[in-house]
Amino acid sequence: MINRITDNKFKLVSKYQPSGDQPQAIEQLVDNIEGGEKAQILMGATGTGKTYTMSQVISKVNKPTLVIAHNKTLAGQLYGEFKEFFPENAVEYFVSYYDYYQPEAYVPSSDTYIEKDSSVNDEIDKLRHSATSALLERNDVIVVASVSCIYGLGSPKEYADSVVSLRPGLEISRDKLLNDLVDIQFERNDIDFQRGRFRVRGDVVEIFPASRDEHAFRVEFFGDEIDRIREVEALTGQVLGEVDHLAIFPATHFVTNDDHMEVAIAKIQAELEEQLAVFEKEGKLLEAQRLKQRTEYDIEMLREMGYTNGVENYSRHMDGRSEGEPPYTLLDFFPDDFLIMIDESHMTMGQIKGMYNGDRSRKEMLVNYGFRLPSALDNRPLRREEFESHVHQIVYVSATPGDYENEQTETVIEQIIRPTGLLDPEVEVRPTMGQIDDLLGEINARVEKNERTFITTLTKKMAEDLTDYFKEMGIKVKYMHSDIKTLERTEIIRDLRLGVFDVLVGINLLREGIDVPEVSLVAILDADKEGFLRNERGLIQTIGRAARNSEGHVIMYADTVTQSMQRAIDETARRRKIQMAYNEEHGIVPQTIKKEIRDLIAVTKAVSKEEDKEVDINSLNKQERKELVKKLEKQMQEAVEVLDFELAAQIRDMMLEVKALD
């Protein structure tokens, strides 16, 4: 039995006070939520402190909150910020726990079966368990998640019902406790004590919860009664304190009791017989043999161990769901009255919409060729309409809300004023005739002031030709294309900020991690060619790249002004006018953002024995690459420990790149 604490409050800790138009945005959002409004949009310009506004809203409405970002890196940044704002509350992180993931697939054209291959990040697995257990134990919970939160997770009821609840004075034999722990997928290991394991020493049982990484619990028996429970350091055994009540959550999210397991196995066997009959009728004997062999092995594992690799493919039977019924997800672990905030909603909602179809087409291939039972199709992400059915109240957060969000609500709350006083940049349109020489003059003017320039083109060839030309003209320039790996990309951004070069040319400069305060000029070539990066939203986002510098300026090179251009220019001018009026009224002088340039030498460069001499990774031999991977792995763990998930994700990608050279 879990005693859920429902009366605790969110406590926001910050040296800041709401400023600019934050107070009115906070007040409107809170009033609308308390008034029962289902959906609203926070349309906040880049750099206006949207995360702080979100934190203020959470603390005032006091509801469990799910914040969804469109990738792990952004989720990590938000998690770090919310942890700082709410040190006394449960701020949790829920993303895919795979460092590397190759889904199970089959390619009929080459008769290639690709087995599921993955590397699970133990730290992220711990954080996922921490998130689900926190949601069942308390009310003051913020979970920052990627879109993996709409994937199947197992039944929250089974998860909660499987909790082993212990307290001093409870009559339970030691052996009964050991059996209970094994039932919820804990593993006995008296030597290697890790998360999800327990060890036994006489009348003492030590349990290492799946949601912890340093602290375990020591349960001491007197006969068939628990004498006392103490929290201890897992490594040293040092006692940290007495515990009145201990709830041990399952070591896996896919858990079921013996009765339900027998029912599930019977259903799996019945479905197997049905599908074998279909294959035999169609003359697919190879597929029938394959399916029979795989499924019978899985059934044996479920019967003996209560678990098998790929157990999630049988989740429909284990959860007792009907065919086509949506799976349980993280959203089902929240109470009914919870709040959802979608960060960068113009990107995230598109991802939520697209998840189902991609998963379905891959799984259908596996079913058709006898690698999985048809019920595996119900181990899937939610459809968008299924996601919508979970929404009680939602806030879409974006500088450029998408069509979907605008269809959901007419309530749009603006946040335009930046705490730094920075204005949206001035935007002008210049003709394409003589554009390169015109741009060269603008770049030279920026170089003299030690400022940087972004140039965005539409084609790879244009970007390459432009880069070559500017190099001939003596400009320090680099081209960032889609083939550049994380390792090099991180280095390029750092070198741009340090002034190793002055101009960065690219096609898509909207990806995360490309916010550079030193950039005072953004040049948009072919601005009148409508498309993904030249529509209104794309242009506004690109213009925002110059909004972190007090000298920010944008030049669009075009022969005609498209509707998208005009709307982007008008919107930027409207915001700029409001910002200037506010600054004038309050005597604020815009200040360029001062952002520390993180030293990435240790992370991005292989350093030879002569400490200062940097070497190219491609020139390293196999042993040196192996040593570098070890170093990077250590640095990744250090980054995770200090909750710097952005850096950890970068290092992880670098490790994969170094490993790929072998």
From Swiss-Prot:
Q: What is known of its domains?
A: The beta-hairpin motif is involved in DNA binding.
Q: Name one GO molecular function term.
A: ATP hydrolysis activity
* SUPFAM superfamilies for this protein: C-terminal UvrC-binding domain of UvrB, P-loop containing nucleoside triphosphate hydrolases
Which residues are in the Helicase ATP-binding domain?
A: 31-188
Q: Which one GO biological process term can you cite for this protein?
A: SOS response
Q: Which UniProt keywords apply?
A: ATP-binding, Cytoplasm, DNA damage, DNA excision, DNA repair, Excision nuclease, Helicase, Hydrolase, Nucleotide-binding, SOS response
Query: Entry's Gene3D superfamilies?
Result: P-loop containing nucleotide triphosphate hydrolases (3.40.50.300), UVR domain (4.10.860.10)
Q: What name does UniProt use for this protein?
A: UvrABC system protein B
A Gene Ontology cellular component where this protein is annotated is: cytoplasm
Organism lineage: Bacteria, Bacillati, Bacillota, Bacilli, Lactobacillales
UVR domain spans which residues? Answer: 626-661
A Pfam cross-reference name: Helicase_C
What protein family does this chain belong to?
Answer: Belongs to the UvrB family.
Q: Where is this motif: Beta-hairpin?
A: 97-120
Localization of this protein: Cytoplasm
Q: Which superkingdom heads the taxonomic lineage of this protein's source? A: Bacteria
What cystine linkages occur within this chain? none
User: Subunit arrangement?
Assistant: Forms a heterotetramer with UvrA during the search for lesions. Interacts with UvrC in an incision complex.
What positions does the entry give for ATP binding? G44, A45, T46, G47, T48, G49, K50, T51
Entry's InterPro entries? Helicase/UvrB_N (IPR006935), Helicase_ATP-bd (IPR014001), Helicase_C-like (IPR001650), P-loop_NTPase (IPR027417), UVR_dom (IPR001943), UVR_dom_sf (IPR036876), UvrB (IPR004807), UvrB_inter (IPR041471)
Functional summary from the UniProt entry:
The UvrABC repair system catalyzes the recognition and processing of DNA lesions. A damage recognition complex composed of 2 UvrA and 2 UvrB subunits scans DNA for abnormalities. Upon binding of the UvrA(2)B(2) complex to a putative damaged site, the DNA wraps around one UvrB monomer. DNA wrap is dependent on ATP binding by UvrB and probably causes local melting of the DNA helix, facilitating insertion of UvrB beta-hairpin between the DNA strands. Then UvrB probes one DNA strand for the presence of a lesion.
Q: Where does the record place the Helicase C-terminal domain?
A: 435-601
| Chief place where the protein resides | cytoplasm
